[in-house]
Amino acid sequence: MHIIAISINHRTADVALREKVAFKADAIRESHLDLFETKSILENVILSTCNRTEVYAVADQIHTGRYYIQRFLARKFGLEVDEIKEMSEVFVGDEAVEHIFRVTAGLDSIVLGETQILGQMRDAFFIAQEEGTTGTIFNHLFKQAITFAKRAHHETDIADNAVSVSYAAVELAKKVFGNLKSKHAVIVGAGEMSELSLLNLLGAGIDNITVVNRTKERAQQLAEKHQTQYADLSNLNELLVNADIVISSTSAQNYVITQEMMNNVLDQRRHEPMVLIDIAVPRDIDPAIELDMNVFSYDIDDLKGLVDANLRERQAAADQIAEQIPAEINEHNDWVNMLGVVPVIRALREKAMHIQQDTMDSIDRKLPDLSERERKVISKHTKSIINQMLKDPIKQAKELSNDKNSSEKLELFQNIFDIEAESEYKKSLAKKERKLSARHILGFE
């Protein structure tokens, strides 16, 4: 059995293409089942976010599995197979396992180390589990990847440092005030950067936010969208007097907050702490403003310097996480290799126990007058003999898990001891047949 991952992401396709191959939320469950019905696919998980569409599968053959996944995607989105090939990356075997770990840990995201993808991957796995399209391999692998990502984020704090200008603005305010929940924030502007700043302020727990814009209707639209307040730009002076945090991002060609305005504001504030953050180009806040010791002012260069430093820290944390992935892959492979050995050992033990039980039945027939104590002693000793006889064969079988020719040698092992173990492949195939049979009986063609 082979693990395959096919990824359409921000590196391989622009946003217009990614939109074409995004699964609708109300169709994702049915899509799992549609792929599961496909020839060669034994297990599958589908991940679909705004930045990536990925299919993970356990297939009986690499080439057929890859083709049927690509064909599935092409048919699902009305494209040609060649179009899917052009916009996707394909990972097989250890590379596919590594890719799953990297994606889950946020190492493959546009925003390096972001944590949202972990929840999205977990949800994708849970949906696949609920629909019955995962089995022994993926149930183990995805749990391992999710656990690894959680641990990696906790140990490295990779997501703690701001790597966007709007988020960095809020982080700077936190450094001044600590907890922001009781603070009043004013956002000057109603564009994309202003909305991102608003979202980050809300995320920091601030609910007293006023959006100010030259066009009052745009301020109203943004404020109502996020259930905050709004005001006309003519009220800015009054708002600044009571504001703790001001984030300005307009397209104005002249200063929106002038020295004269701030002189008046500072006189009324009585030296209360205040943070001014200017993320506009050209600048909205006059750099000539004479600030007192309790007013902290930052512009776009200050923020970019912080973002750049944080990006370096994130990259160092990402490198640290990436260094741990090979060990996780080895752990996964060791577990997979043992999958082939465990049924063989189980079959050997079962055969030995049958022999022991047959022996005890024969003794009972030939020596019917044995006391219960005598029977228990004989049973104990026959089991002991069998366990001693099995010790070396079982040890040899376990060592085969690390042998590159383990399949052939395990088959020889079974022939020598005249046993037959059910392989993981046969179990997966049987599970798939049962699932599809039940689905067809219920009328889901």
Swiss-Prot record:
CDD domains: NAD_bind_Glutamyl_tRNA_reduct
Gene encoding the protein: hemA
Record-level GO BP terms: protoporphyrinogen IX biosynthetic process
PANTHER family the record matches: GLUTAMYL-TRNA REDUCTASE 1, CHLOROPLASTIC (PTHR43120:SF1)
SUPFAM superfamilies linked: Glutamyl tRNA-reductase catalytic, N-terminal domain, Glutamyl tRNA-reductase dimerization domain, NAD(P)-binding Rossmann-fold domains
Protein family (similarity comment): Belongs to the glutamyl-tRNA reductase family.
Annotated site residue numbers, Important for activity: H99
UniProt-listed PROSITE patterns: GLUTR
Source species: Staphylococcus carnosus (strain TM300)
Binding site for NADP(+): G189, A190, G191, E192, M193, S194
Name used for this protein in its record: Glutamyl-tRNA reductase
